Amino acid sequence: MQEMLRSVYAFNADSGNRKLLKHILRAMSLIDRKLFTYFQNPYEDNAIPIGRNQTISQPSTVARMLLLLDLKEGDNVLEIGAGSGWNAAIISFLVYPGDVISLDRIRELVDSCKKNLENLKQNVEDDGLIARLEDLYFLQEDIFTERGLWEKSFDKIIFTAGIPDKKTEKKIKDIAKELLNENGILICPYVSGPLVIYRKKKKLIREETKEQYVFVPLLEGTEE
């Protein structure tokens, strides 16, 4: 695990937010990645498969996205693309006592996230860590077609799958307009390209990272 954490630090040392990076590294050390994947080498700083043609991002990329979100204690966060649940658990640790809602369109992955979270709780003796995960919720929902969450608002929104086309990017911009609180941040990658960042300050401000990434595509509809 230490080698993974050193790699995460090296990739993100120039982020300009050393305090948050320190908290992210602590969260990654406490929320054991091996409990969220069946992969043989869970501590490699690589994306790894979790089944159903899905992957979870490499830890360095996870940290970079969370740094760009500028997570703060008390933030209410929406994640689209629950994956294995590891990213959401880290977010929950960082924003406690804020709520974290993590969505996935595939029920099997949602059920797996819930099991992984319970497995983590059973394998730690730190009541403080467990308390920081109590307001984390995994739901099956397609954010584009099922608008059950559209009456809520969030301080931060993170997509963990990539924008495949302009039509989808327009929908993501609409989500930023409708669901972000003032001063909120939304981050979403392309399938291949930079990370897109929307900041809501009376109007939406769009930015892109210089770095390029590769993600599985963001899809619509639900599956079992």
Region annotations inferred by a language model:
Residues 1-78, 86-94, 108-120, 211-221:
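Class I SAM-dependent transferase core
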Residues 70-205:
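Conserved nucleotide-cofactor-binding alpha/beta core module
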Residues 192, 197-224:
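Substrate-binding/catalytic lobe of Class I Rossmann-like enzymes that use SAM or dcSAM, i.e.
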